[in-house]
């Protein structure tokens, strides 16, 4: 992989998610240069100018401009957000037929520029699209990843915070598998204040007798659909997730994030992208952290892998 000054990010797709992700990157001053690409050049230009107009009030100036695929050549990260708003209560896999053509065209154009950075896939179904982008791009496995279950994990922590009244940042643990209906909460990994969550509830029955892990997991799974039904789409949560992943990679933070990455023997799976805890570094998905899951959790992970793999068949 080419060694670069970690300072340039390209976002392809300036809809709600792409534009909000750009706003997060700019407000946090994550890079020196941010380039926006869209099928509508006017839309990309408008978003870039709107973002740049607030530069006086940012902690760090980020140069924002509209561009084209040639700008990907020396980019450190390309974020792909192309797609359309899903209807309420829809399965993310239902977007596959529409999205795959868009993603294929984007990946081809990105690679034609000479790009050798990290692709961060956001487009749904994200696990399938990350696998497709990896296969189509020819990049090493570390350099293609999806947002995976990072947002779902954040939702889990938020909901546990709502149920207990405690700061969600006290919660540890992961949602794993597909970013979709077959995702699962790996309860064996969940802790609150360093104490296993099941034990925390048992030790505080007088306060949290009404807290149900089954209900928490279902709320986590359906949270996205509820937001879509209420406001027509999701953008803030996923955009914050994207900004966090971008920061972790650009700044080589070595954070462990449940992104969608290629399993090649880990958890007994091969040739499939799933949301699993992964150490993120400047080179992308540096190393998968293989957790000691329960037998039930492993079965759920394998089930999720089967579903994702089925939808990958025939795409190439």
UniProtKB/Swiss-Prot annotation:
Keywords: Cytoplasm, NAD, Oxidoreductase. Its EC number is 1.1.1.27. NAD(+) binds at residues 17, 38, 43, 69, 122-124, 147. The keyword Cytoplasm applies. Substrate binds at residues 92, 124-127, 152-155, 234. Catalyzes the conversion of lactate to pyruvate. This is L-lactate dehydrogenase 1. It comes from Bifidobacterium longum (strain NCC 2705). The gene is ldh1.
